């Protein structure tokens, strides 16, 4: 098996890069998907709302939190009980799939990497940092945006806005 872990600030282009990697035969997974499914059940809202930037900013839960704040709160509360809780759920989904090449579009903490390494000990793992041109801080005030700074990534993709040819060339050298 082969795993590509993508990390970068919100808006850096992680999903854009992941989608291009999918076009090369990979299957895309997000560690946040089980969180979004859980929140969808808890709030009785469509799971799609948990991925919609406008809904995450405008929808207010009964306790006054935005949907984004609520998703982060649920994720952190469960991580306090088990730091690998969401990664374990994602790893289980992968175990029951036939996919042999996986790209993670939202890698944010080391527990996710460690869980995948333990679950798939013989897998090849590639860790990639995506940097958007001119983006030095995250537009989202969340500590997980910064948790992998200083990690020794094997590759860095420079996402220069609008230069898809250069972006594709970098991706092909990794996947």
For each of these PLM feature ranges, what is it?
Residues 1-4:
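Extreme N-terminal starter segment of soluble prokaryotic enzymes
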Residues 23-29:
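Post-Walker A helix-loop "phosphate-sensing" segment adjacent to the P-loop in P-loop NTPases
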Residues 33-101:
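ATP-dependent small-molecule kinase phosphotransfer cores
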Residues 17:
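Hydrophobic positions on the alpha1 helix immediately C-terminal to the Walker A/P-loop
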Residues 14:
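Conserved lysine of the Walker
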Residues 7-8, 65, 85, 89-90, ...:
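Small-molecule kinase domains that catalyze NTP-dependent phosphoryl transfer to phosphate-bearing small molecules
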Residues 27, 89-144:
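ATP-dependent NMP and nucleoside kinases share a basic, alpha-helical "lid"
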Residues 11:
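Walker A (P-loop) phosphate-binding loop of P-loop NTPases
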């Amino acid at each position: 098996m082969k795993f590509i872990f993508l990390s970068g600030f919100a808006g850096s282009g992680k999903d854009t890069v992941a989608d291009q990697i999918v076009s090369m035969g990979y299957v895309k997974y997000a560690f946040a998907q089980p969180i979004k499914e859980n929140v969808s059940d808890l709030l009785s809202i469509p799971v799609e709302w948990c991925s919609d930037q406008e809904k995450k900013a405008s929808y207010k839960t009964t306790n006054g939190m935005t949907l984004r704040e609520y998703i982060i709160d649920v994720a952190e509360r469960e991580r306090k009980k088990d730091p690998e809780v969401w990664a374990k759920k994602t790893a289980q989904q992968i175990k029951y799939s036939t996919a042999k090449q996986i790209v993670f579009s939202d890698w944010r903490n080391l527990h996710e990497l460690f869980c995948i390494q333990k679950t798939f000990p013989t897998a090849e793992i590639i860790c990639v940092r995506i940097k958007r041109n001119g983006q030095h801080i995250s537009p989202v005030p969340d500590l997980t945006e910064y948790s992998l700074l200083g990690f020794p990534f094997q590759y860095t993709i420079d996402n220069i806005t609008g230069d898809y040819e250069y972006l594709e060339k970098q991706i092909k050298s990794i996947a």
